Amino acid sequence: NTVSSFQDILMRMSKMQLGTSSEDLNGMITQLESLKLYRDSLGEAVMRVGDLHSLQSRNGKWREQLSQKFEEIRWLIEEVRHKLKITENSFEQITFMQALQLLLEVEQEIRTFSFQLI
């Protein structure tokens, strides 16, 4: 379940002490939370039949926003991969590997939801 995975990974990431890069880590946590909310809102839109019109009326630039979210995911994937390469702490390695897997799952879910909306 990606919801519990999100909560677990965010909690573990927030407990990490990466020295000077803690600002980077906080930024990653914030972006992960933002992506989770976006994924959830797309999922809700898909569950409501014909909600594409509602989505378009609330957010005329939803396709542009979707593209931006995919860029954010790709950037986060690169950041997580970089952190994974430089850390030697096994707890951090496991956490970043799970975060990477979660990002790939979320990317796939957002892609699936967006195809259902088009």
Swiss-Prot record:
* Keywords assigned: Host nucleus, Host-virus interaction, Transport, Virion
Q: Which GO terms describe its biological process?
A: exit of virus from host cell nucleus through nuclear pore
Q: In the UniProt record, does the keyword Transport occur?
A: yes
- Sorted alphabetically, which InterPro entries does this protein's record hold? Flu_NS2 (IPR000968)
Q: What cellular component terms from Gene Ontology apply here?
A: host cell nucleus; virion component
Motif: Nuclear export signal; annotated at 9-18, 82-91
Location comes to: Virion; Host nucleus
Q: Which SUPFAM superfamilies match?
A: Nonstructural protein ns2, Nep, M1-binding domain
Give yes or no: UniProt keyword NADP: no
Q: Which domain of life is it from?
A: Viruses
Assembly, in brief, is: Binds M1 protein. May interact with human nucleoporin RAB/HRB and exportin XPO1/CRM1.
Family to which this protein belongs: Belongs to the influenza viruses NEP family.
Fill in the misc note. Average number present in a viral particle is estimated to be 130-200 molecules.
Function field = Mediates the nuclear export of encapsidated genomic RNAs (ribonucleoproteins, RNPs). Acts as an adapter between viral RNPs complexes and the nuclear export machinery of the cell. Possesses no intrinsic RNA-binding activity, but includes a C-terminal M1-binding domain. This domain is believed to allow recognition of RNPs to which the M1 protein is bound.
Q: What is this protein called?
A: Nuclear export protein
